[in-house]
Amino acid sequence: MSIQSIVTKETLKKKDTNIEIQEKNMNDLVVSASRVIAPLWPISTFAAHHPWMGLEKQSFEQVANWLKEARNVDIYPSASMIHSAKAKGEIEESFLQIALSRWLDSQSFHMPRETAERFCQEALKLERLPSSLLSSPELNKLAEEISYVNTGSMKDSSMQPISSLIENQKGDNLSDILNYHIIKWCKLYLDDTGASWTMPNREKGFYRAWQHLITFDPALSKNERKVLKDWPEDPLIALTKALSELGISESNMQAYLEGHLLSLPGWAGMIRWRSQQSIEEQELLVEYLAVRLSMELAIVKPYLPLKNQKAEKKVSIVPLIASWIYWGDISVEKWSQMSATEQSELLAFAYRFDENTRKKLWLKAWEQTHAEQLREKIASKQRATNDKKRVVAQLAFCIDVRSEPFRRHLEKLGPFETFGIAGFFGLPIATTELGSNNSHPSLPVILKPKHQIKELTDENEYNSYEQRKKIDSSVSYTFKTMKQNVLTSMLLPEVSGPLLGLQMVTRSFVPRSVGGFIRNLRKTMLQKPNTTFSLNHVHDTNCEIPIGFTKEEKVNYVRQALKMVGLTEGFAPLVVMCGHSSQSTNNPYAAALECGACGGAAGGFNARVFATLCNLPEVREALSAEGINIPEDTIFAAAEHKTTVDELEWIYVPKLSETAQEAFDCIDSIMPNVSQHANRERLMQLPNFKTKIKNPSKEAHRFAEDWSEIRPEWGLARNASFIIGQRELTRDCDLEGRAFLHNYDWKQDESGDILASIIAGPGTVAQWINLQYYASTVAPHYYGSGNKTTQTVTAGLGVMQGNASDLLSGLPWQSVMQSDSETYHSPLRLLIVIQAPTKYIERLLNNDFTFREKVQNGWVRLASVDPEGRWKNW
């Protein structure tokens, strides 16, 4: 026996240490790789997120180029979108020329400037190079002749999964086969529908549950199962072993893991979200990658080692030469007569002025045009006047873009003042509605709840309500149980067919009547008794967070919200806190239409809690001591803005003072007219309507009740700006429902803390919403979720196309497209406009590194309006 084969305690200890170091490094690699995917919340909450939130340390341009190279995904607007926008006057040619001139100034080249400009001007027409030119023998012969030209800087450095490079004998790409298997195992493990038969050993974690079953999988060949039979039981060791046997070098491991995460970004995103929810599943992403790469090894092993696997991929010079022939008027003959240096410079210039660069300049021009049009709109409405009309009521709405038209019509038709604030009203709460055993974090998903608020009522009333709820839920519970049971599911069509058939016919042909009848019936049956809230602080050991608020917390949250919108004096007799909700039927994306600031739920609960706090005598006394005097006859109430039908539903109206009652009656009398105007404006934007609508409110209700309606409302489509300032800045401006509006008075914010909190909270949520719509528009096949009519809701988590696709993470086609060829949403990065002195913006950028990084790297745009009305782009 040789000395090398003797394993001593020392070598064992050293080996164990190496394994620990290796495992730690692998964990770090997975964490670093995970930045390329965004956490995906279940569709029941549909929290707004943008897919590049982990990549904001890179510039938007860098991420766009990387995605094009790594996944062939374009995240700039397409040529057709750009041409359409230009035809509609959304892009000024002058801004494109400015962008081009600046780009040329930033480049180093030795050719005449006129030659470069002429080439760029032609290339910016975004015409495709003719296929006849690209395939011409003369061009390809020329490319071979000048292949000696130095193109060292032009390399394709992307790292693709090995399975994507191999096809089996049937011509199927092995990555598609791998994805099929991974989707199957993810659905089994993540299923949240409470299926009768769940994945065995699920409680042991994804990897170990998979390992117990994989050797019995009939979809794998005998040899594939053999590879996995004696596979390591530890997911980290399995992942390390798979990478080693696949021949992935240590320097390429992170890029390789990123490639696998990007192969199914939806399922990987859901796995990542789950890993953040509990300690038990914090290693879930490691387990997912261990399963995926272990299966990849089993599938590709017969084909290993690959020829040219490590060969450096070079960029083809054929399209680069063709671009100069087509756009630069340089013929094949002229190319042949050039020196190698001249040829190399032309190739390098064409490589730099690629499709992404051209689209980047168009996007900048589009965004600059939008900013200029918004500046002109705001400037035209600014008035130097002090004659304020008498206000009988003040209404605070969510910053949601759908609030803007409603607020505009409300102010126009009555003596009202409106405010904009994030729809959770600054309350970091988890809400538990009456009769519910589950709480919902009713705040932006970037925050964690600090208080539990329960809805309460008298015991007798509660028992009666619970009994009615059980009767209502028994039918759906029975139906669900039968559907998920192996035997009863076969009887279900026979039992339920006649009733469901009748429902289908009536819902399809008379949706408004039937939907209204069912809704009113359930509303009557499930009418809540009068309820209160657990507002007072209680320490409950059974709850992770305390129930209710202390007196100091009550005062703090009210003070904070009132100061945030600048409402610290001049209170009207009636102040209404308006949450918002949506109303639609048969819509898996219902949560996407709810309040994003409330975690994908209706905002009425938060509005009611906040209004109740504002009416508490102890809160008012404490605020008065600080100089915020709320008059005794000023009453706070709560309502919910139904965005699908543009109605205001009262949800909390305490005893009103005489003046508050007058204001309440005034709102009620004017509201039908407001709804008609807001609905008419909104419905005319839908593709179904091109003529005048006789009864907009009636039509809006039909859309809400029709279960075949794929587009009950546009949601937040066309959002483009987030305006932080006093209402006077935008009052009477028709912002077309494209602006998030947040009240802010810089005079009450000497420290800048209020502005900083608006940017960190609502500003971030608005940016996520904006980039989610952006991504779903520019890359619907990758970041969208396809057509609603062909989707399948799966595992209680989200939607798929068919039964074996990625878990679709973005918005459906109907949320962003006007037609098959025309977009409705304009893919522009969010423009944040702040009304404040220049020094406030400078301080914000100096203190908030994260926000400064977003602005510098092109993830948001920033402008300001100073006290004199001067606009500045940052």
Swiss-Prot record:
It is found in: Cell membrane. Zn(2+) binds at residues 398, 400, 580, 595. Keywords: Cell membrane, Membrane, Metal-binding, Transport, Zinc. It holds the Pfam family DabA. One of its GO terms (cellular component) is plasma membrane. It is a peripheral membrane protein. One of its GO terms (molecular function) is zinc ion binding. Its cofactor is Zn(2+). InterPro entries: DabA (IPR018752). Belongs to the inorganic carbon transporter (TC 9.A.2) DabA family. Part of an energy-coupled inorganic carbon pump. Forms a complex with DabB. This is Probable inorganic carbon transporter subunit DabA. The gene is dabA.
